[in-house]
């Protein structure tokens, strides 16, 4: 394989995830920075009372990762509001990553918007650059955009019956 993606779920520092974080640390040590990449997915909450995004939770989770021997290369920041350049610079400075490596992952209307949002944020370019990959041709997303257009602008309405234990939850 040219690239292997591995997701570690959970919260940094939880006892359940420690063996997996240690595996990432060891793998990073064996492969080196030029052949491995750590993307840290983090929440940047918006406090309505203060009308501001809070970066402290991200700073603390990165600090915890660092204490376990893992330095993220990219911060993928889940957020309800756009990350301004000042917020990006602040997170870059306090989390020891490049400003271009602070990627906004703003809440999307549908999960199918996410690839286009990440392309807009240039995540692909950052990954290609950090891994020193040669093939940098532009992706052809015409089919994806057509699919997304049909999804967002349906021609017909279909009623679907759903049977299940937890289907009343909003995210079901």
Which residues make up each language-model segment?
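Generic enzyme active-site microenvironment
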Residues: 5
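N-terminal beta1-alpha1 cap of cysteine-dependent amidohydrolase-like domains
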Residues: 8-172
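Short, high-confidence coil segments that cap the C-terminus of an alpha-helix
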Residues: 1-2
